[in-house]
Amino acid sequence: MWIKSVCLFATIAGCLGQRGGPYKVPDAKLEAIYPKGLRVSVPDDGYSLFAFHGKLNEEMEGLEAGHWSRDITKAKQGRWIFRDRNAELKLGDKIYFWTYVIKDGLGYRQDNGEWTVTEFVNENGTVVDTSTAPPPVAPAVSEEDQSPGPQWRPCERSLTESLARERVCKGSLVFSEDFDGSSLADLGNWTAEVRFPGEPDYPYNLYTTDGTVGFESGSLVVRPVMTESKYHEGIIYDRLDLERCTGQLGTLECRRESSGGQIVPPVMTAKLATRRSFAFKFGRIDIKAKMPRGDWLIPELNLEPLDNIYGNQRYASGLMRVAFVRGNDVYAKKLYGGPIMSDADPFRSMLLKDKQGLANWNNDYHVYSLLWKPNGLELMVDGEVYGTIDAGDGFYQIAKNNLVSHASQWLKGTVMAPFDEKFFITLGLRVAGIHDFTDGPGKPWENKGTKAMINFWNNRFRWFPTWHDTSLKVDYVRVYAL
């Protein structure tokens, strides 16, 4: 099976891209520019990146970086162009190379390229007769167009691990999503969930794609929608079976029926995951996002365990929150991020880090980052570190002291257990639930109340007027190797 993941080759070598599949990278056009310079190009076919790696008069050893190693992120006049204005070539020189493109979120290579200099051309591509050509006039060069000369940048193996990667190079970009599409079909790396979420947080929403996902100015948009607006008034007191359910069929993940104080979740939102395409262990994830505004909304910018090695309940296998900000104005100046290893406080939030903002965090876009290392975590926002978690001798003892029964499972792993396995990325939006908001004045439900969800719904006249800018907007997601 083709694994739909992205392996970018920014200043690296040896990081293996994905092969197989029907798409063929077009042949690269190489040109020796008179009196000096090299130009390499391919026609644009909807790519999001073009990379060129080559060596002069020396064969490539597999997927090494080469003397030339350059990623191009923008096409010009219908072509993706690599330019080295300082390359001094002569007739008979031979360039060995490979190219790499990203198309629809997938990476493709053209391997074993060879090209020999048989002629020189002007900047406009016309052939130059070097025996009669006048001294050239150097064109004006913008700083953006300048390219460094050949450099050797060998691959140093990273501690980062990724699905379908035999080798990951230090500092390499191993996943990238810019949300430049216009529909979910354009997101090859993501799968949308369609299900009723349950334990351990029991939020008051269901996940679907019906009206809850969109795209705006290059950003993914996840918005809350009233369930009754999709179905009919009173559906929350009825029964709802989800078509195309991605949860476990025949369970409460796919079917809900109102009974007593329990109702069908009154709000629909969305959640997207890379579970089927990309997961990694150790690295740095950057998410540029604008948080939602509105009472009792919770953004989900998370890393979730791929295999639940240490258990699949009560966060026994861990959850890493890259960032979250509660949507209520009274809470929105405080940013949180970090690990969760239990469903209940005090240990649930004990290791979370926070940062007080001068203004509400949901006023604008920010870059939220989590650095995941073999011995701890760091939380950052806009490049500034606001929290560190040192694993020390492991999390078992502190969890045991806080009566976390599943902590003994972590003794099977390393000091980072349960965060020593692969995790995948999730982006979504949650509503209320029983753990993220403490009971108190102004909160229309009690977390342990038997009628919590219906009390939340019956008080919609209090919270719904605050839902003006409720969308979670994500500009990009990037994962870098250590």
UniProtKB/Swiss-Prot annotation:
Q: What is the protein name given in its UniProt record?
A: Beta-1,3-glucan-binding protein 2
Q: List the GO molecular function terms.
A: carbohydrate binding; hydrolase activity, hydrolyzing O-glycosyl compounds; pattern recognition receptor activity
Domain (CBM39): residue spans on this chain? 23-122
Q: Do you know what upregulates this one? A: By bacterial and yeast infection.
Please give the biological process terms from Gene Ontology that the record holds.
carbohydrate metabolic process; cell surface pattern recognition receptor signaling pathway; innate immune response; regulation of innate immune response
**Glycosylation site positions:** 124, 189
The record describes the protein's role as:
Involved in the recognition of invading microorganisms. Binds specifically to beta-1,3-glucan and lipoteichoic acid and causes aggregation of invading microorganisms. Binding to beta-1,3-glucan activates the phenoloxidase cascade.
The record's account of how the chain is modified after translation:
N-glycosylated.
Q: Where is the GH16 domain?
A: 128-482
Is this entry keyworded Secreted?
yes
Alphabetical GO CC annotations of the entry are: extracellular region
Does the record bear Electron transport in its keywords?
A: no
Q: Where in the cell is it found?
A: Secreted
